Amino acid sequence: MLLTTTDVLQGREVERYLGIVTAEVVYGTNVLRDFLASLRNIIGGRTRTYEEVLENAQKKVLEELEQRAKRLGANGILGVSIHTNMSATMILVTAAGTAVKLR
């Protein structure tokens, strides 16, 4: 499966557009992790705890997007975008793209 943020893949031709695919991953926040992250923010530096959560969420959302595209018979997804939203109680990562059958 080829995923790209662009609308075309150089050297590949789109045989058929199969539709928009979307995926979502939601993680609840953790009180201890939040406390440790806030301490890190006070003394400065990166909060690796949240970076790891976001990294994992992005990986999972792309895996889910790929699975949904495969169910449509796609072997590529064009125009992939990933968005992250955080609130006091959750982290939401969404992804979307156009499933295609490439030659």
Swiss-Prot record:
Gene3D superfamilies registered for this protein in UniProt: Hypothetical protein apc22750. Chain B
Protein name: UPF0145 protein CYA_2258
Pfam families assigned: YbjQ_1
SUPFAM superfamilies in alphabetical order: YbjQ-like (SSF117782)
Family to which this protein belongs: Belongs to the UPF0145 family.
Organism annotation: Synechococcus sp. (strain JA-3-3Ab) (Cyanobacteria bacterium Yellowstone A-Prime)
